[in-house]
Amino acid sequence: MEPFRIHKGTAAVLMNDNIDTDQIIPKQYLKRIERTGFGKFLFDEWRYDNNRQENPNFPLNAPDRKGASILITGDNFGCGSSREHAPWALADYGFRVIIAGGFADIFYMNCMKNGMLPIVMDKEMREKLVKTDAREQIEVDLENEVITTSTHRFHFTIEKMWKEKLLNGLDEISITMQYEQEIKEYERRVAVY
């Protein structure tokens, strides 16, 4: 996993509450286990019309929001079933940071495990953040837990364990591999039955 320290990018805004994983990526696209190729199905039923043409009224389709790597959204983002395909679709689309009023627990952990930073931020702060010009680069500094725009500085908090994993680009496997020698030594000492 790529370390996450400071990210600069533009933001897309989708301030709906209770966006569930089936709205993030509908179930018909979950037939693969590769982590890539899901971005084109992100928010599929909202992004496209019945002819698979982009819906011009959907916020992510706005020309000035294309290429955004920060998503600002409502409360309880990622609720519903605990499919890991939802964070895969967000990451494959290009999002590195998701700022919401809250997240479903499993979705929150799956974001972290896939190198995305989910940030919990109250509504008043998010409303200030969404007023940022669509072309402005927003800086997200994980190490100092600060989001900076040209007019505001917002502080956020993150659990130390998750922060360290993201800062160092570590997932469960890479953490386990840090103890490879100890594991081999243990296996050598323990009798086989």
Swiss-Prot record:
EC number of the protein: 4.2.1.33
UniProt protein name: 3-isopropylmalate dehydratase small subunit
Assembly, per entry: Heterodimer of LeuC and LeuD.
UniProt keyword annotations, A-Z: Amino-acid biosynthesis, Branched-chain amino acid biosynthesis, Leucine biosynthesis, Lyase
The protein's annotated pathway: Amino-acid biosynthesis; L-leucine biosynthesis; L-leucine from 3-methyl-2-oxobutanoate: step 2/4
GO CC terms, sorted: 3-isopropylmalate dehydratase complex
Family statement drawn from the similarity comment of this UniProt entry: Belongs to the LeuD family. LeuD type 1 subfamily.
Organism: Bacillus thuringiensis subsp. konkukian (strain 97-27)
Gene: leuD
Catalysed reactions, as listed in the record: (2R,3S)-3-isopropylmalate = (2S)-2-isopropylmalate
UniProt-listed GO biological process terms: L-leucine biosynthetic process
Superkingdom classification of source: Bacteria
Stated role: Catalyzes the isomerization between 2-isopropylmalate and 3-isopropylmalate, via the formation of 2-isopropylmaleate.
Keyword Cell cycle: no
Record has Phosphoprotein as a keyword: no
